[in-house]
């Protein structure tokens, strides 16, 4: 594996983790907001 492919894989993995984190956080906020009301 070259350094370039490792950097590319790392960037893709980071993007996926960020998207999953945002979706998870949004879902938790939505659930908590629904319970509050």
Curated annotation (Swiss-Prot):
Membrane topology according to the record: Single-pass membrane protein
Keyword Transcription: no
GO MF term set: electron transfer activity
GO cellular component, one term: cytochrome b6f complex
GO biological process terms held by the UniProt record: photosynthesis
Segments crossing the lipid bilayer: 11-29
InterPro entries for the chain: PetM_cyt_b6/f_cplx_su7
Compartments, record wording: Cellular thylakoid membrane
Keyword terms: Electron transport, Membrane, Photosynthesis, Thylakoid, Transmembrane, Transmembrane helix, Transport
Subunit and partners: The 4 large subunits of the cytochrome b6-f complex are cytochrome b6, subunit IV (17 kDa polypeptide, PetD), cytochrome f and the Rieske protein, while the 4 small subunits are PetG, PetL, PetM and PetN. The complex functions as a dimer.
Function: Component of the cytochrome b6-f complex, which mediates electron transfer between photosystem II (PSII) and photosystem I (PSI), cyclic electron flow around PSI, and state transitions.
Family to which this protein belongs: Belongs to the PetM family.
Protein name per Swiss-Prot or TrEMBL: Cytochrome b6-f complex subunit 7
Gene responsible for this protein: petM
